[in-house]
């Protein structure tokens, strides 16, 4: 769907050896934003992508820009305390604000929308989330009336969140970068990246490859798992007016784009059984019988065990190597927050061990 409305810039593959200040590995939203901000700061930066820019998860997003990541704040407050939970909230609010500012100059269908997390049957969960947000100084609303085709126990509302066309935005941010497509990094030797047709020698490296590929350090394969979800883009369906997601992991999400309803769900842990396309198709047929499926796609997301992305030094033993991963299905604000933090780190404006 997004690929039909965006013309991504094209870059050739690396041929020969190059040097740079910073190498960014991975050409999704996080990698593009890192390279974009470093270029703006006057640093020499190379972006290496194994396929095409935005060929992975970024091209298969529902593109909600929100600091409301499910009912996350009650858990963060209990697990990490008010200071760190507040840091998570403020980092994502800052990411939303950065998108808002950039989108004034980029034609990408940016629209402010209220975001809602609803529960079918557990009002208590919603009340706990509202109490946690109040402790963090954030005003959220409550409603039990949503324009969805089923009753809910209620919903937590964040006002003035946003949605956009992610590839039109990414295409604008990626123009003018020193980038190489079809250039998979086979291994790292310190901060030098070996590819099929040349080596990129950098002072610092940011790994933004969805799942970190360097298994010798960081043990990310032990700290994350994969979750698969599905989306139908329906013509002649309802205009729901906002962005809605079930607090349950297997629930449904709704938002409109390009005159269509994006219906998400059927989620399951990768390798396990789940509802998949059949569940979404049955729901659409039952509740939107006149709708027509224009597009369909699936996405696979990296989920962290504690619900917090990994953004910062790759590991304690890898100097000048940084990572952004584990966005827990909230890739748009997480990618922006990661780019803002990591580009400050590589410029020395933020200590590597500084709190987020």
Language model features with spans:
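Glycine-rich FAD pyrophosphate-binding loop
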Residues: 40-60
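Helical element adjacent to the flavin cofactor pocket in flavoenzyme catalytic cores
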Residues: 130-133, 155-204, 208
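Extreme N-terminal leader/targeting segments of oxidoreductases
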Residues: 1-22
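Flavin (FAD/FMN) cofactor-binding and adjacent substrate-gating region
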Residues: 1-4, 71-78, 97-169
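C-terminal catalytic lobe of FAD-dependent flavoproteins
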Residues: 248, 277-279, 288-356
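N-terminal Rossmann-like FAD-binding beta1-loop-alpha1 element of flavoenzymes
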Residues: 18-47
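Glycine-rich active-site loop/strand segments that organize a redox cofactor
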Residues: 60-91
């Amino acid at each position: 769907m997004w690929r039909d409305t965006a013309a991504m810039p094209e870059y050739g593959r690396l041929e020969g050896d190059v040097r740079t200040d910073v190498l960014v590995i991975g050409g999704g939203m996080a990698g593009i934003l890192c390279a974009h901000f470093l270029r703006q700061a006057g640093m020499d930066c190379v972006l290496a992508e194994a396929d095409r820019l935005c060929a992975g998860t970024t091209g298969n997003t529902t593109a909600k820009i929100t600091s409301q990541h499910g009912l996350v704040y009650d858990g963060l407050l209990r697990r990490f305390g008010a200071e760190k939970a507040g840091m998570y909230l403020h980092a994502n609010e800052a990411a939303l604000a950065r998108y808002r500012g950039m989108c004034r100059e980029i034609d990408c269908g940016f629209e402010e929308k209220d975001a809602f997390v609803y529960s079918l049957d557990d009002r208590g969960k919603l009340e706990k989330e509202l109490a946690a947000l109040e402790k963090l100084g954030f005003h959220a609303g409550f409603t039990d009336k949503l324009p969805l085709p089923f009753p809910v126990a209620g919903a937590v509302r964040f006002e003035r969140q946003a949605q956009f066309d992610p590839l039109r935005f990414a295409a604008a941010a990626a123009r003018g970068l020193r980038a190489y497509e079809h250039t998979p990094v086979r291994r790292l030797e310190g901060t030098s990246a070996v590819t099929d047709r040349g080596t990129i020698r950098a002072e610092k490296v940011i790994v933004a490859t969805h799942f970190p590929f360097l298994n010798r350090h960081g043990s990310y394969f032990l700290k994350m798992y994969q979750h698969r979800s599905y989306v139908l883009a329906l013509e002649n369906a309802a205009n729901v007016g906002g962005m809605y997601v079930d607090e349950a992991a297997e629930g449904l999400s709704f938002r409109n784009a390009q005159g269509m309803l994006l219906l998400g769900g059927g989620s399951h842990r990768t390798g396990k059984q789940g509802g998949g396309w059949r569940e979404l198709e049955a729901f659409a047929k039952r509740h939107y019988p006149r709708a027509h499926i224009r597009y369909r796609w699936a996405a696979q997301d990296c989920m962290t065990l504690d619900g917090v992305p990994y953004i910062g030094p790759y590991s304690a033993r890898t100097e000048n190597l940084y990572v952004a991963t584990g966005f827990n299905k909230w890739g748009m604000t997480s990618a922006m927050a990661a780019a803002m933090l990591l580009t400050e780190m590589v410029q020395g404006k933020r200590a590597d061990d500084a709190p987020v």
